[in-house]
A protein has these predicted regions:
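C-terminal and late-domain segments of enzyme folds
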Residues: 2-58, 70-85, 166, 170-315
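General beta-strand structural signal in soluble alpha/beta enzymes
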Residues: 35, 92-94, 118-119, 150-153, ...
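Short internal beta-strands
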Residues: 61-67
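Portal/gating segments that form or line small-molecule/metal binding sites
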Residues: 69-113, 119, 126
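Catalytic nucleophile loop
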Residues: 118-121, 140-164
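Glycine/threonine-rich flexible loop motifs
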Residues: 124-134
Length: 315
């Protein structure tokens, strides 16, 4: 097993790494997902959300997976520097760039004992093809079930959904070809699909196209250096940008099947929302949590109603 590691004294080493025992967490029954739209700053709020969740600044162990990168070892070295800059000292990144490495029991054991597991960016299709269904994949799921925090940035975030999106970058007219849809790791449910670098790479049209073709899917477009922190069915937005959500269940007309031949997209009654930093998206209801709560309070008759009246007017 080839690996790249950092330790508490900041030095690196190559070779087999001995993993600690698996830690079962009794404070919660499932972990947290931190989904970052790419290009996260080492000391920014998006990556900071992951470090806080897995208590990395207080000795929590992080295991990184850089399989999505064209150069997993180079990416591992870069991430070790970024995590060190952020203040995380217990970070291990085993090099997994082939299927046989994803079946390595030593790497799986390392992952099972981690407080946080980090998926770097690159090619989400390659990541899922290499790791999906392997011992590493099963170890990630086991750790998540026991309360570990799973973080992905860019392709690493896109791969955590049930269905992944790749390719099909729009041209200046919003037209595209060669869209790829395939199975992901499925840790994020709710029939959600993630697109990253969303505002920065003008991917709104691409997400519209995919949702038009798959109207039951919930599209999530995450900006760079921005995270959607998901616990249960609630996702809080943290960082510099926003998260766009797209719900196609109410669409009345679209010509999505014609668009792959170069025709412009025509679409009506698509539901779109933008969630800024500090606000929470209810993934189950596909709505801002503040509005879900308001509806529930109104239905229960407990919502407050403030009315100012002119003097002498009876209430």
């Amino acid at each position: 097993m080839e690996s790249s590691t950092s330790t508490s004294n900041g030095t690196g080493a190559r070779g087999a790494v001995k993993a600690g025992p698996t830690r079962r967490r009794s404070d919660r029954t499932a972990g947290t997902l931190v989904l970052i739209g790419g290009a996260c700053e080492p000391t920014g709020e998006a990556l900071g959300a992951f470090l806080r969740q897995c208590k990395a600044l207080d000795g929590g162990r992080i295991v990184g997976i850089t399989t999505a990168s064209q150069d997993p070892a180079g990416s591992a070295r870069d991430w070790l520097k970024s995590f060190a800059e952020a203040g995380a000292t217990h970070v291990e990144i085993p090099i997994v760039d082939r299927r046989d490495q994803a079946q390595d029991r030593r790497i799986a054991k390392m992952i099972e004992g981690a407080d946080g597991i980090f998926f770097g960016g690159g090619d989400q299709v390659h990541l899922v093809a290499t790791v999906g269904g392997s011992r590493v994949d099963r170890a990630v799921r086991e750790a998540y079930a026991n309360g570990a925090t799973i973080c992905g940035t860019s392709a690493g975030a896109a791969a955590l959904t049930e269905t992944i999106l790749a390719g099909g970058e729009p041209d200046e007219y919003g037209q595209m070809q060669d869209l790829h849809l395939g199975p992901g790791f499925g840790l994020l449910g709710f029939r959600a699909m993630i697109d990253t670098h969303f505002t920065q790479r003008r991917r709104l049209q691409r997400l519209f196209m995919v949702i038009a073709q798959n109207p039951e899917t919930l599209g999530l477009g995450i900006d760079e250096d921005t995270a959607l922190v998901v616990q249960g069915h609630l996702g809080e937005v943290v960082g510099r940008g926003s998260v766009t959500f797209v719900d196609g269940r109410g669409v009345r007309f679209d010509n999505a099947d014609e668009c792959m031949d170069g025709k412009p997209l025509t679409l009506s009654y698509l539901r779109v929302g933008i969630v800024g930093s500090g606000y929470t998206l209810n993934l189950r209801e596909r709505e801002l949590e503040v509005l879900v709560q308001a509806r529930q309070e109104e239905a229960a008759g407990v919502s407050e109603l403030e009315v100012l009246r002119s003097e002498g007017m009876e209430g």
